[in-house]
């Protein structure tokens, strides 16, 4: 059912005058509402909701929530953090991430962001890419023609090493990196389950899964804490992210980060710098293998620009089609597939009065697969992002990294790493999907591709 209401723009934005449509998601069942649909088939459920309005009511048990399905409504939510607060659901993520940038709120978030932002300025990102290129070349140096590998697992292993090198540069051995990766997967999966669980009591029970989660969380933070303490003792500046964080000062107060604050930020960057980028790369290589005509254009562009040498940071702006492939992969398979806010006060959204304490959902999955925003949305079409066609995309329709003051601080670094790794691998190898392989995206803390066996073919 769709209803029409007057446009009531948030004070922080000026949307065009148009009648918003509101509706209710079908299929609600007594007591549970739409909870089971969101649990069992979340991607399909979310992608179906824009057909019911710009703002769609969803029942989560006895509570009402709303999914913002129009880019302008999502912008109003993300650009007005004082009204649309991160909410209690982020408190569960603090078990892993502490009071880091990704979960902090209000003035604390603004304070942290101003301190950390210099670590992601362009000269710093350019410096980090040397480690990315070195680790990628080392990883593919052991590949053999005809070898079958799980590209998802392979990219996660590579990106954990890249993240460790970007953060620490030296002083962390391969065994510790592997242990940290193992712990990170357990804790990341556990955070998602705890965030989505309807009852908070489950995480307090002494189950094998909870004990495994607690051990992994403690060990991961211990590994990072030891690295921080050692770097403080040495006082050395290795030009890596850890050195930048240890020397960070607020531009107005001159205050730096203590070891606990650095620990929280480093763990956050490990999660964001390995899990999300690794999944994106796995999706990219699967899509290239499944679309030979696109792969051929990527190879032709890389060969023309690189002329047989390894790619560098300076080459990336010239790899326009390759970057279009990455953007289209992020559209089809956004790492942050759903997020939420909670209204801190009564407000209006999409022509509806929304009480304080109401959960507001927004979903890149719903936006990116909306045929009104992206014609033929299930089609893999990198040319959407080239030339005049890219200008036709509605503002805010693409949302892989969020928006506003809470937009992912490392988005440029993530895109840079992804493009550099794709160009490095594609300059030397083709990856062919094993016949019969079916891509089944797994919505967890981030959208993961699941196992993707592929066969290596030298170019």
Curated annotation (Swiss-Prot):
A GO term, aspect molecular function: monooxygenase activity
Swiss-Prot/TrEMBL keywords: Heme, Iron, Metal-binding, Monooxygenase, Oxidoreductase
Top-rank taxon, per record: Bacteria
E.C. numbers: 1.14.99.61
Region (Disordered) residue spans: 1-27
Binding site for heme: 408
Gene3D superfamilies reported in the protein's UniProt record: Cytochrome P450
Known function: Involved in the biosynthesis of cyclooctatin, a potent inhibitor of lysophospholipase. Catalyzes the stereospecific hydroxylation of cyclooctat-9-en-7-ol to form cyclooctat-9-ene-5,7-diol.
Family according to the record: Belongs to the cytochrome P450 family.
Protein name: Cyclooctat-9-en-7-ol 5-monooxygenase
Organism of this sequence: Streptomyces melanosporofaciens
Record gene name: cotB3
